[in-house]
Amino acid sequence: MGLRKIIRKALYNLKYTKKKSNSVSGKNFLITGASSGIGLSLTKSLISNNNVIGVYNSNKSNLDNIQSNNLISVKCDFRNYSDFENLNKVISEEKIDVIINCAGTFGSNNQSLENIDFDNLISVFKINSISIIKILQLMEKNNSIRSLSKIVNISSDGGSIKLNNQGNAYIYRLTKSALNSISKNLSVDLYNKYKTEVVTIDPGNVKTGMNPKGFLDADKCSEYILSLVFDKKNDVHGKFINLQNKEIPW
């Protein structure tokens, strides 16, 4: 790593030196993308004092390493609608208080206009955007949605229409923009019906499998997410925010 990048990383992490306490307990979480990255960090952080349904795509090994009776692991490939039946069996039997939707993928490497792979676009759209609607539709049908107090959608400022001054990355941008639109819609519909709060969070430059050169540790990111969502001083419902609780334009 070059000196300039070391300095940039150090300056970036200075914003996140404050320790955030995790006092969340006694709740029932559904976490998508739970087998890696931010989803895995959240699962590990919450599992000792809460129940977690960890939804994974294919690789379960990281969840298997968590030794806890509070964890239910469920395989669901969001690209395959028949897989949602696995999830439906669980959510119809388990109470869910909070959904943290971390599942996401960047898509193919070259996403310039002339190189868009439309099969890949549809696959990424199913993962990044449609999956949360499908989960909530299942919960609506089996009436378990009534217990849902919070939905947290992990998005990206790459989905912000107003902030887009770079172009490119068509697949990633449009699927995250769609997720943002879905979040805003849910914040109206579900709050009116069930008082369910919905927040959309851009975690920033986090080091994950999708972003191996990221600056911020996933555990530190998870710490800030939980503080944002569960600190009663924070009014985050219906907003698109970063980890510093600053609003991002849609």
Please tell me what each predicted stretch does.
Residues I31-T32, N101-C102, S149-S156, E197-D202:
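Structural signature of the Rossmann-like NAD(P)-dependent dehydrogenase/reductase core
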Residues S35-K44:
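N-terminal Rossmann NAD(P)H-binding glycine-rich loop of SDR-like oxidoreductase domains
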Residues Q67-S82:
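Rossmann-fold cofactor-recognition segment
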Residues T196, T200-P203, P212-W250:
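C-terminal helical subdomain
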Residues T105, N109-F125, L148-N192:
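Catalytic loop of short-chain dehydrogenase/reductase
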Residues M1-N28, K89-I91:
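Non-catalytic terminal and boundary segments that flank Rossmann-like NAD(P)-dependent oxidoreductase
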Residues N49-L63:
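Conserved glycine-rich Rossmann-like NAD(P)H-binding loop of the short-chain dehydrogenase/reductase
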